[in-house]
């Protein structure tokens, strides 16, 4: 029976007062009954637009129809025919600007909760079946994948399904890329990422950690050792700073480092020996999802006050509305239309405050957003002992600098053609290494496209 309710079926969540001090997952997921209730909101459009908004082309109406029937296994099989990582995308994909943005139900009310349903199906399968994929017979061709984040994992999975012998190289000691070092446990439990890595290994993908391509091995050496193509999905891990006075003080760090220490190296665990600054009052500079993650981690690590300092207004914040909402519920204070101009230190070289100036919005800039302009004489002090810079990241130049013929743009992003091939024949790339910091699902889409292009390239030789 169709469910004509104008709003989504609510997702159970941890109480904000409780979750603000723990790292357990915030969103608890649908029950089977709730999933079926939400699936029944789908109108079964003859010409569904939702699929057009999905970077990995999930057959959304088909999987939702199976959820309506209670056939969750079939729903999972439909999703994974094009999306290798539904438990991940169902949690961190910005559906509100993609598939759900095109849902007809959104015209008069809220769209169908496609992301929540995808997550439910993936979780149900993992908890009730969790069958490992079968290894496909080898076609005798070797491909290297550099980086084990969403782009690399997707490319490796698709290539393995085609019969390629795939080796995935990860620079850190744990595979998963940004999924393990960047996204906190309370948004994406690491056990889920580990399960996806296990599935890749079941497909025959060899996962090699502590392998920094460009230092331990170069791209040229990969080709010399028999790999016929290389996919570079090494992400964008080089943080940007403001270059204001005081950035070298103790207590200032990038969100990239802060989240890596907290998430990958488990600084939140009292048994871990990972050093991380546990502040009483912290400021996170920036307004994206990474800024929200850093601010929410700061609160969980014991801070009494955490501020998000952003130079534009709240309406211009790039962070997902859901992440902003969760941050506010947990006690994070937003300081919008403000910009730091100096970080103040004490006699020991430690942060003791941040001098800011108020901003106003002028005419739109090249990004289409109104340009922030300083308001003269509006300086004020923010009493903080920690400052986390979350201003975006660029790709690390290591691979480019050690690979002849590999060209990048002015931001250090690899230049690729319409088939994801770089300026070096046989080297393909996708994800943040090409686009700069973007979304998990766009990286997954690039991984799919890169795998298909590598297959065509090798077959054409």
Predicted features along the sequence, with ranges:
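Ferredoxin-type iron-sulfur electron-transfer modules in oxidoreductases and energy-metabolism complexes
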Residues: 19-37, 59-91, 108-137, 262-263
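Feature captures the FAD/FMN-dependent oxidoreductase FAD-binding
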Residues: 74, 137, 142-146, 194-244, ...
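FAD-site-proximal beta/loop scaffold in flavoenzymes
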Residues: 248-279, 364-437
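Glycine-rich dinucleotide-binding loop and its adjacent helix/turn
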Residues: 121-137, 195-215, 239-301, 408-419, ...
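Rossmann-like dinucleotide-binding cores of NAD(P)H-dependent redox enzymes
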Residues: 168, 172-203, 207, 295-342
């Amino acid at each position: 029976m169709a469910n004509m309710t104008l709003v989504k079926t609510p997702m159970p969540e941890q109480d904000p007062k409780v979750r603000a001090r723990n790292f357990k997952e915030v969103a608890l997921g649908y029950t089977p009954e709730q999933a079926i209730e939400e699936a029944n909101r789908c109108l079964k459009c003859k010409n569904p637009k939702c699929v057009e908004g999905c970077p990995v082309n999930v057959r959304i109406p088909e999987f939702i129809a199976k959820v309506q029937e209670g056939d969750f296994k079939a729903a999972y099989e439909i999703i994974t025919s094009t999306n290798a990582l539904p438990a991940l995308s169902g949690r961190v994909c910005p559906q509100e600007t993609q598939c759900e943005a095109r849902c007809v139900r959104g015209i008069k009310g809220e769209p169908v909760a496609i992301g929540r349903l995808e997550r439910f199906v993936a979780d149900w399968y993992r908890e009730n079946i969790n069958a490992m994929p079968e290894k496909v017979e080898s076609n005798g061709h070797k491909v290297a994948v550099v980086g084990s984040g969403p782009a690399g994992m997707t490319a490796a999975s698709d290539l393995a399904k085609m019969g390629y012998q795939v080796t995935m190289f990860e620079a850190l000691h744990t595979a998963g890329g940004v999924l393990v070092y960047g996204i906190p446990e309370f948004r994406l439990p690491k056990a889920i990422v580990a399960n996806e890595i296990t599935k890749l290994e079941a497909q025959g993908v060899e996962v090699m950690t502590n392998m920094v391509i460009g230092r331990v091995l170069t791209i040229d050496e990969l080709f010399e050792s028999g790999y016929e193509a290389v996919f570079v999905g090494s992400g964008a891990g080089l943080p940007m700073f403001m270059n204001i006075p005081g950035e070298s003080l103790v207590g200032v760090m990038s969100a990239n480092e802060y989240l890596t220490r907290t998430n990958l190296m488990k600084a939140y665990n009292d048994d871990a020996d990972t050093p991380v600054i546990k502040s009483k009052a912290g400021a996170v500079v920036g307004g994206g999802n990474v800024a929200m993650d850093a601010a929410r981690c700061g609160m969980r690590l014991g801070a009494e006050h955490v501020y998000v300092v952003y130079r534009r207004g709240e309406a211009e914040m790039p962070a997902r509305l859901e992440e902003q909402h969760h941050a506010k519920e947990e006690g994070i204070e937003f300081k919008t239309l403000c910009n730091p101009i100096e970080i103040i230190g004490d006699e020991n070289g430690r942060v003791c405050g941040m001098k800011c100036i108020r901003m106003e919005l002028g005419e739109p800039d090249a990004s289409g957003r109104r340009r922030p302009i300083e308001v003269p004489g509006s300086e004020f002090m923010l009493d903080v002992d920690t400052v986390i810079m979350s201003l975006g990241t660029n790709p690390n130049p290591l691979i480019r600098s050690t690979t002849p013929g590999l060209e990048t743009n002015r931001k250090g992003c690899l230049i690729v053609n319409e088939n994801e091939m770089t300026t070096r024949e046989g080297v393909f790339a996708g994800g943040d290494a090409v686009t700069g910091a973007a979304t998990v699902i766009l990286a997954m889409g690039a991984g799919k496209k890169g795998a298909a292009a590598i297959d065509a390239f090798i077959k054409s030789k």
